[in-house]
Amino acid sequence: MSHIIELPEMLANQIAAGEVIERPASVVKELVENAIDAGSSQIIIEIEEAGLKKIQITDNGHGIAHDEVELALRRHATSKIKNQADLFRIRTLGFRGEALPSIASVSVLTLLTAVDGASHGTKLVARGGEVEEVIPATSPVGTKVCVEDLFFNTPARLKYMKSQQAELSHIIDIVNRLGLAHPEISFSLISDGKEMTRTAGTGQLRQAIAGIYGLVSAKKMIEIENSDLDFEISGFVSLPELTRANRNYISLFINGRYIKNFLLNRAILDGFGSKLMVGRFPLAVIHIHIDPYLADVNVHPTKQEVRISKEKELMALVSEAIANSLKEQTLIPDALENLAKSTVRNREKVEQTILPLKENTLYYEKTEPSRPSQTEVADYQVELTDEGQDLTLFAKETLDRLTKPAKLHFAERKPANYDQLDHPELDLASIDKAYDKLEREEASSFPELEFFGQMHGTYLFAQGRDGLYIIDQHAAQERVKYEEYRESIGNVDQSQQQLLVPYIFEFPADDALCLKERMPLLEEVGVFLAEYGENQFILREHPIWMAEEEIESGIYEMCDMLLLTKEVSIKKYRAELAIMMSCKRSIKANHRIDDHSARQLLYQLSQCDNPYNCPHGRPVLVHFTKSDMEKMFRRIQENHTSLRELGKY
């Protein structure tokens, strides 16, 4: 029978370390938060080998008194709270007194500290949680904590560490979040002698954003603010033109503490409304100041999850703050860009009826579609009047061709035994079999469509032999573009187009680090970025399959996708890249196109390997048969048939 015993202090600390200290980034987080609570205005983080060999945090805070240094390494020893009431009004980042003893239990820890007015400082050395020495030492006011050989006595934890690049990325992300949470503090992160991140510590949030995300991104962010009796909201969000492929660039802080909250993320997106594309997310740095009594941070070991009273009111306040700030922005660049790409149809001239005679049909086998000459258009352009003036012969012929049913080219296809159909000895069963085969071929082919209109700048209407077809113009062009890109990206042409003015791309330090590791994937699709300055890359030439006007947005999109890829597969990456590029370059909803462009799109769609679905799997067209239409208008009756059953994909 096993007996209940009290665990030794060191073992208890190691158990606590399993919850609090997951990786080197956890050590950085806990020690930097202690430095912030100590009132520091400057914090320097130095690491070696992604923190596994060494992590050193130096601050200019209040320091620790000589007689309290050893006590700081005991569990639940803290200066942050004194009684139970303090637990419900936490104003500091730390309060449990677990971090320092947990870190010391799985590393070799050296602490050097001094307080203002003391004759000397104090040095403490601990190994695996056991204090080896505490001696007087010379030290400036503040604290320096050096953590070496992390997880040396817990090899199982060390075994599951990721690559140094991945661990370094986590550390950079932690420091970036802390820098955004406290713009009044100067942060500096140095990895193996190279500075990765620096913030000025001026107290200006926009300057902190510029130091982390770059000046270009900071300029494209707008200020937000809102408040009520319980909450005060401030911060910056990006304009709709600056987005990312994931939520990693959304930072929420409550009383200076970085938190993760799904509902508040939802509120941010609601504030943008329809201004964001599907699958795109803004950059956001939002500070929420709240009475500590309304927030419970003691619900998770890492303290990143917070329970908030009046959460619905807070969500509404965040959404309102963002929506109000966006209303004040003209967003003219987006409007001009859309206007430049749009085509407005001329509704005043009847020359719309004088169309290429063969463009109503989509399959051209031997002859190319011909357009009437400019002379023909001038000679036969006719103005329609209410008196019903006679049209010229040419105009009548044109209208006659438009109103005739489209030619069914697939009906002209000959089966393999076509010549045998006229054979006098061929029986009726063979003839029926041949026709059945012909019908199957017709059913499996894309229908011949005759375009006749557009609705709401989004849907195209066309008729075929067997009824009405409604086509989603965005999905249709997305399918066309996808198959083009799939071909061009799948077989990368090494030909490059030289740029007169190179493009400079800037990323946060953790993203830049990850991109360096995965750069060969970009090169596989013909994109060659070279390092250029701190956390910057330069593009001097671009692949010929990429349009020059889409280089900047396209490269950022590709890099975003690359950063999301956890298991690198060039085949999967190329497929996802083709989908992304096709979606971005396709016609959007509420975009009117002229008749010629619509017919051309339908022709291109008919040539696709799979014209029925967009790359995301959504249907491209919906079909209503003539019989379906007659049922809708009750021209014929059929029992137990609902309108929902009439649409067919």
UniProtKB/Swiss-Prot annotation:
Keywords: DNA damage, DNA repair. This protein is involved in the repair of mismatches in DNA. It is required for dam-dependent methyl-directed DNA mismatch repair. May act as a 'molecular matchmaker', a protein that promotes the formation of a stable complex between two or more DNA-binding proteins in an ATP-dependent manner without itself being part of a final effector complex. GO terms for cellular component: mismatch repair complex. InterPro entries: DNA_mismatch_repair_CS, DNA_mismatch_repair_MutL, DNA_mismatch_S5_2-like, HATPase_C_sf, MutL/Mlh/PMS, MutL/Mlh/Pms-like, MutL_C, MutL_C_dimsub. CDD domains: HATPase_MutL-MLH-PMS-like (cd16926), MutL_Trans (cd00782). Transmembrane segments: none annotated. PANTHER family: DNA MISMATCH REPAIR PROTEIN MLH, PMS, MUTL, DNA MISMATCH REPAIR PROTEIN MLH1. Belongs to the DNA mismatch repair MutL/HexB family. One of its GO terms (molecular function) is ATP binding. It holds the Pfam family HATPase_c_3. GO terms for biological process: mismatch repair. This is DNA mismatch repair protein MutL.
